[in-house]
């Protein structure tokens, strides 16, 4: 699919990326689109929550650790709390896999977040093929 044609390349998995920096978000989005991932970009916790409630096709959340209006862990705990409150057939929020992207490569921090339930902790610079492999593990 050519960019000039106006057509969108077919995608197979829809991911939400809650990002802190525009430049890295667009680079990651372009790389993921080449591998048939639709990466929805949002830049705040508030916007992420809105998208998650509205879009039932989102399969996984990628989230920068530090955001303009809070942290990835605040979003993670909010989503888990809301999902746990609804024990019904079609809850408003599903327990989506949650990945944290960060420059902090402290093993103790990674252990703490994984212990709390975060599915993956990826340090910068992001290795795109490795990220895709990890994402596919959770969405396929």
Where do the model's predicted regions map?
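Alpha4 helix (beta4-alpha4-beta5 surface) of REC/receiver domains from two-component response regulators
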Residues: 73-74, 94, 102-120
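Non-catalytic signal-transmission and effector/linker regions of two-component phosphorelay proteins
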Residues: 1-31, 35, 46, 77, ...
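A Lys-centered signature of the CheY-like receiver
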Residues: 123-125
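Active-site residues of response regulator receiver
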Residues: 63-66, 102
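Negatively charged, flexible loop motifs adjacent to catalytic sites
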Residues: 47, 68, 104-108
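Residue-level signal for the "D+5" position in two-component response regulator receiver
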Residues: 41, 67-70
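Acidic, metal-coordinating helix/loop segments flanking the phosphotransfer/catalytic sites
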Residues: 41-60
């Amino acid at each position: 699919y050519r960019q000039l044609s106006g057509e969108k390349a077919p995608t197979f998995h829809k991911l939400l990326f809650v990002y802190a920096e525009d430049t890295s978000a667009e680079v990651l989005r372009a790389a993921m689109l080449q591998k048939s991932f639709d990466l929805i970009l949002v830049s705040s916790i508030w916007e992420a929550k809105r998208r998650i409630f509205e879009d039932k096709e989102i399969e996984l959340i990628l989230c920068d650790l530090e955001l303009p209006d809070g942290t990835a862990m605040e979003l993670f705990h909010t989503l888990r709390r809301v999902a746990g409150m609804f024990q019904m057939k079609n809850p408003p929020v599903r327990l989506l896999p949650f990945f944290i992207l960060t420059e902090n490569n402290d093993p103790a921090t990674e252990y703490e977040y994984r212990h709390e339930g975060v599915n993956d902790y990826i340090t910068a610079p992001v290795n795109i093929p490795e990220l895709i492999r990890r994402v596919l593990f959770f969405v396929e």
